[in-house]
Amino acid sequence: MAACQEVRHRMTSLSADLKNRRNAERATLIARRLAAPAADHARWSALIEASLRGGFSALEGMIVGFCWPFQGEFDARPFVTDLQGRGVRAVLPAVVAKGQPLEFREWWPGVAMSNGVYDLPVPVGSSVLTPDALLIPALGVGSQGDRLGYGGGYFDRTLVALHPKPLAVGLAFELSRIATIVPQPHDVFMDFIVTEAGIEAAVAGGLMKLSAEDCRARVAALAAERGLPRRESSGAAPAN
């Protein structure tokens, strides 16, 4: 009995230590990102958008989830709006309950919105759809494709809950690189990481640099392997 209590104590202490470490890492990374000069932020964002346009054209015909930019994150809206013109339906995440997977509501320019968690806008009254691919902002990026978010665990729970699993594309700036987030069993790794330095795929042993052509091929292969896009992805997008 005493041995079991000691093990539980060590696990609790480790969990508390890791939580404190991650929170400190988050504060550092947010401050670093917000301190980036506007000109650098714009240049990095343009490079990320160019990589997305070059490597992820295979997302056409899918339902693509993205996030409203927050605290200096890359703004995916121009890329997503361009995809919408080529048959993609776009969705934004909404928190429906603490500790639950996210709900995804269809978005287009001009859709009615209200503020949700973190005061981020979410669509009101639009269709709830299941994404085939997710463009997920990363506060920190580890060397294995592990992603540090804001601590709510919403994307981890969502990626576990959705079958087939959507393509997970982590978006970050190079200043968000960390050695590791010390992944736990509940942490879900990204399929791809895109920064201003280019595109990487998460593979056994780490991250592998991809050309735009190689990325398109890998996206298509993963989509076919997982049975994406889903049937509901085939509807026409609403007029903007």
Q: Where are the regions that the model predicts?
A:
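Surface-exposed, charge/polar-rich loops and edge strands
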Residues: 2-20, 24, 31-35, 129-134, ...
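Short glycine-rich anion-binding loops that position phosphate/pyrophosphate groups of nucleotides
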Residues: 69-72, 139-143
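Conserved residues at the C-terminal ends of beta-strands
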Residues: 67, 137, 196
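N-terminal active-site beta-alpha-beta segment that forms phosphate/nucleotide-binding
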Residues: 2-4, 8-130
